[in-house]
Amino acid sequence: MATNKEVVLTYEGLQKLEQELENLKTVKRREVAERIKQALSFGDISENSEYDEAKNEQAYIEGRIFQLENMLKNAKVIDEEDIQTDVVSIGSKVKVLDMEFDEEVEYYIVGSTEADPSQYKISNESPVGKALIGGKIGDIVEVTVPDGVIKFKILEIRK
């Protein structure tokens, strides 16, 4: 099921997806084909768990390859030259002050494909990302969360 939804990526995100695709096509495909071949050598495949496992992994790999190719085909790469430092946009690194806890946090605003909250990479589609996009230094933005509202003051915007 192909989709033509635009996939917003940073250059770093594009490289990561291309590397994953290359690894799946060259290394993982070969490995799983070898495992299938080996499992077939055991004879009867009707009760061959190694064969079933390898075929399931093959299906996953082929599905992921299809997904990655589709994402790359529809990729819109954010050019670092287009990232402004006066307004928050995708590709911005934003230092904010969490006004409730008086803590500074730096977020990297990325497309949803690259989001990784554990690395402070937040999606432009997330509640915090949506609130920050378009903000300027000194702005106070509010994010509605299940427990109420969080306020952030934008301290710094950089590439």
UniProtKB/Swiss-Prot annotation:
GO terms for biological process?
DNA-templated transcription elongation; regulation of DNA-templated transcription elongation
Top-rank taxon: Bacteria
Alphabetized UniProt keyword annotations: Coiled coil, DNA-binding, Transcription, Transcription regulation
Please give the Pfam families that the UniProt record associates with this protein: GreA_GreB (PF01272), GreA_GreB_N (PF03449)
SUPFAM superfamilies named in the record: FKBP-like, GreA transcript cleavage protein, N-terminal domain
The yes or no answer to whether the keyword DNA-binding is present is: yes
- What GO molecular function annotations does the UniProt record carry, in alphabetical order? DNA binding; RNA polymerase binding
Per the database entry, which stretches of residues form a coiled coil? 3-37
Q: Would the keyword Transcription regulation turn up in this protein's UniProt record?
A: yes
Role according to the record: Necessary for efficient RNA polymerase transcription elongation past template-encoded arresting sites. The arresting sites in DNA have the property of trapping a certain fraction of elongating RNA polymerases that pass through, resulting in locked ternary complexes. Cleavage of the nascent transcript by cleavage factors such as GreA or GreB allows the resumption of elongation from the new 3'terminus. GreA releases sequences of 2 to 3 nucleotides.
What family is reported?
Answer: Belongs to the GreA/GreB family.
Question: Could you identify this protein by its name?
Answer: Transcription elongation factor GreA
* Organism this protein belongs to: Acetivibrio thermocellus (strain ATCC 27405 / DSM 1237 / JCM 9322 / NBRC 103400 / NCIMB 10682 / NRRL B-4536 / VPI 7372) (Clostridium thermocellum)
Q: Which gene encodes it?
A: greA
